[in-house]
């Protein structure tokens, strides 16, 4: 079986179940987006949603994918950076409990923390304090992390750090890994569109997007977006919620 390495923001997720969109509107959070906030802000927002049903676990986009693969008995590992605190320990323990090899470094900031607001239609809206996750840098990317793996799964949120993502892609290519990229959030796609298209064309083998991200990436509806995405990489996937996924191989 193929071995998969993940890299992304090492975050602890607090999942908050909402009954409707009212709280998102009150907090001025665009539904389906990811908004970066300070540590003080995320503490304040979490305090304001005390009455909602919540659960906590190790998270982050790429880490969640790696957890899913580990649950299917795929050999996996994850690269990230956490703080020297309880949340960092929770994140590392969560990886080990699923037999995921933790390639984790420790930063100076507090561990990253995300509030994931889930509405009844299963749409997720994030407010994220990146903390130590933001300190991951090209010098942290040791060749030994990549050795022996067949695929690298990268989260699109790393688009916000161009030098880091460029180094990741080059390191993966050097070690002959296939590269899988999940676009992560439509607003991140919009803010980095030009460089993103170049990276997909030059490095990415498998590209994932939901309907909003595919629209932001191509300006087209899912079926047409899939065709355009497939012209840039080997396999394109557009996730369409309850409708499953559209897949096209080049």
Report each predicted region and the residues it spans.
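Hydrophobic/aromatic pocket-lining and membrane-interface residues
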Residues: 65, 69, 78, 95, ...
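A general structural signal for well-ordered alpha-helical segments in protein cores
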Residues: 62-66, 88, 165
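Ribokinase/PfkB-type carbohydrate-kinase core domain
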Residues: 1-30, 54, 89-106, 111, ...
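A glycine-rich beta-to-alpha transition motif near the start of alpha/beta enzyme domains, typified by
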Residues: 43, 50-52, 75-103
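Conserved acidic
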Residues: 57, 61, 83, 87, ...
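Glycine-rich phosphate/adenosyl-contacting loop at the front of the ribokinase-like
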Residues: 1-77
